[in-house]
């Protein structure tokens, strides 16, 4: 039997689509842990409006949230973020070094 591989985007796109990305990390990390225990091994964990909403609306640091996400799922789970093309996580185009930095960090 072939395995179907998929990526869970609910912790980025789901929050962004329904709640305007305004969800506190402490409120959803238990769900991340449960999803990981259920066997999900690939998550989209940030980027897009989620990155800036943490700073502007939640008073949280996006990098701290990503560190916590990694801690909860462990080292063997694949994480990725959404980049807005050449804007990366900003609202305006970014220079090449910023695009590369985003790719290297996330």
What are these regions (language model features)?
Residues 27-49, 101-106:
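Catalytic domains of carbohydrate-active enzymes, especially glycoside hydrolases
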Residues 47-106:
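Active-site beta->alpha loop and helix N-cap motifs at the rims of alpha/beta catalytic domains
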Residues 1-19, 66-71:
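N-terminal amphipathic alpha-helix/helix-capping segment at the start of soluble metabolic enzymes
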Residues 3-6, 14-16, 42-44, 76-82:
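Structural preference for beta-strand elements that scaffold enzyme active sites
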Residues 9-30, 80-99:
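Active-site mouth loops of central-metabolism enzymes
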């Amino acid at each position: 039997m072939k395995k179907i591989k998929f990526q869970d985007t609910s912790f980025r796109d789901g929050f962004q689509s329904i709640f305007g990305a305004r969800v506190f990390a402490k409120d959803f990390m238990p769900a991340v842990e449960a999803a990981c225990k259920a066997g999900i091994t690939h998550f989209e964990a940030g980027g897009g409006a989620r990155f800036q909403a943490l700073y502007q609306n939640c008073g949280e640091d996006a990098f701290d949230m990503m560190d916590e996400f990694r801690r909860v799922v462990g080292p063997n789970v694949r994480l990725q973020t959404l980049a807005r093309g050449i804007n990366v996580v900003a609202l305006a185009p970014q220079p090449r070094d910023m695009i590369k930095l985003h790719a290297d960090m996330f």
